[in-house]
Amino acid sequence: GYSSADAVITDCISNIKALSTKYNCDVMVVETGMECADDNGKLASTSVLNEGKRQLARILKECKENTNGRCKGVFYWEPECRPSQYRLGAFTEGGYPTVIMDAFK
């Protein structure tokens, strides 16, 4: 289904198009991140991690295909952070990438 995160992504892409047109400039998405930890600082459930991958894949696809070529890249902020360190990282407590990072494949 359509989530509040989907609405945020839709709005983000609209803003990229509007700003790049208004200011005639290229843009980048920086400091994006997906939920990888639960409220206790433990690795989130498989379904939460898969949803993060889906959202990140959508951001990457939309930025590449739906910004009239004006979005020049997407940075994931601190993906190497472990769940106990940062809720929006993308690695396990053992230091391995979660499925979220597969969105970049």
Each model region followed by its residue ranges:
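Aromatic- and acid-rich polysaccharide-binding/catalytic face
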Residues: 1-17, 21-36
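Aromatic-rich peripheral "rim/lid" segments of glycoside hydrolase catalytic domains that contact
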Residues: 11-14, 18-21, 37-58, 62-105
